[in-house]
Amino acid sequence: MDLMVSTSSAQEGFCLIQQFHREYKRGNKLDVSCRTSGSISSKIPLGSRKRNRLVLVSAASKVESSGLNGRAQKFETLSSGYSNSNGNGHYSSVNSSFALEDVESNNHLRQMVRTGELEEGFKFLENMVYHGNVPDIIPCTTLIRGFCRLGKTRKAAKILEILEGSGAVPDVITYNVMISGYCKAGEINNALSVLDRMSVSPDVVTYNTILRSLCDSGKLKQAMEVLDRMLQRDCYPDVITYTILIEATCRDSGVGHAMKLLDEMRDRGCTPDVVTYNVLVNGICKEGRLDEAIKFLNDMPSSGCQPNVITHNIILRSMCSTGRWMDAEKLLADMLRKGFSPSVVTFNILINFLCRKGLLGRAIDILEKMPQHGCQPNSLSYNPLLHGFCKEKKMDRAIEYLERMVSRGCYPDIVTYNTMLTALCKDGKVEDAVEILNQLSSKGCSPVLITYNTVIDGLAKAGKTGKAIKLLDEMRAKDLKPDTITYSSLVGGLSREGKVDEAIKFFHEFERMGIRPNAVTFNSIMLGLCKSRQTDRAIDFLVFMINRGCKPNETSYTILIEGLAYEGMAKEALELLNELCNKGLMKKSSAEQVAGKM
């Protein structure tokens, strides 16, 4: 694109047009030059002409080096010309306000934005505008985006306000960034407010951003109103627009209404793509109409759209969730026969379902065939299998596949290790569990809270609370905050070991940390007290439990009744049992069981 401006003198000729960025982005060649209406007067001294040329070259080089390849700064030449009052042609002033000062300021702002100095950039922008400089919208848009990413939409909105009042003209990209920031922050009303006041026409991206936010918030009716406004402003929906609305309609109003929207989409000349069809297939499956979804899948090619692996995965998952795993296996075989390349997700859907159903042999067959079809199993492929072996107490097979997994270059994740640790602890192999836990960090897998809780609980149940407490200290050192499960395990273990006073100490530490004890924790303390023939303290603890807002359960009362009987107060125990039954606090069947043990 040839951007030339006719001027009456060379110093007025240097001009950058506001549309520079858009033309550059479109790939048009820009020729920014000046065209003079006549030759430069011979009366102008050669030195002055050279200085004038240097001003132009300097400005041009600053523009070039500043990277103004986007929506460029508008430079104007407001020179006062040459003064010839004395007839000697001296250069009186070149008040160049295609503004080197603006260029320098914008360069500095741009540099701040590039280095992530958002707050400093904001202050500099305010100072720029205060001194009359016109900001370039490219770094300002980047500033808006940066603050939006930090959730500081108010600061971002202030930048947009500064831009609008400075003489700069924000374009649709700037507004889209601001609207997107509001939508991501859940401030949809503010986004709509920006849409209403935009000084340029919104584009399809603007509307799609707002429609996505409204639909995700369950505001389908309002989204349809925005669609109407979009059409009124001659902004035509694209496939993304309709797919957003079809997905929301499937969720909120059902597939029947979504199909009407699909028809409208076609009537407007907008062709659905595979993503649109996948949304509909998913909606049909969620309504429990699997056979209809399969028919829809088979009809897609005749509608001009080939299903992809995601389409098949949706159907496959629905087949598995409804127990039709044999159909799922047939669908996988059909995919392979037709030349579709299944993804690792495809295989994992089937493996996961078969393992949950205890069909480990079939799951192994599928896992072993994956490499033949260009898919390497990942940790999500092995984890269900390991869990299945652990559930069936086949620890040898679980360890075998764990080793096979590693030998094939697939490294276990924390879910893998948690599965193995849980199984080892349940099997009483807590020392093995501790050994694995100690090796996790060296294997590049950081333990999480559930990892520690699993081993702490295993140690506590195995009567090794000393080691469990050491693990508690270790997890605290790693900034992992203990929870109710952590303390309940320790309190229970200490109580069972007869260390009830130490258990009570941990209980109060528990409370000081703001962790709310549950009935299991209270019951553990009461059981420890009753076993140490301190039923009176156990009764006090029951009262304390009620005062703390924790409702006793049948186990709480059973512990106390058995504690009274254990201390030779069978009569009092029976009286309490009858009273609890009469008040409906214990079932008659439970009371009879307790009475039978006395």
UniProtKB/Swiss-Prot annotation:
Keyword Cytoplasm applies: no
Swiss-Prot/TrEMBL PPR repeat ranges: 101-135, 136-170, 171-201, 203-237, 238-272, 273-307, 308-342, 343-377, 378-412, 413-447, 448-482, 483-517, 518-552, 553-587
One matching Pfam family: PPR_2
PROSITE patterns recorded: PPR
Domain of life where this protein originates: Eukaryota
InterPro entries named among the record's database cross-references: Pentatricopeptide_rpt, TPR-like_helical_dom_sf
Entry keyword set: Repeat
Family, per entry: Belongs to the PPR family. P subfamily.
PANTHER family reported for this sequence: ATPASE EXPRESSION PROTEIN 3, OS02G0565400 PROTEIN
Protein name: Pentatricopeptide repeat-containing protein At1g09900
Source organism of the structure: Arabidopsis thaliana
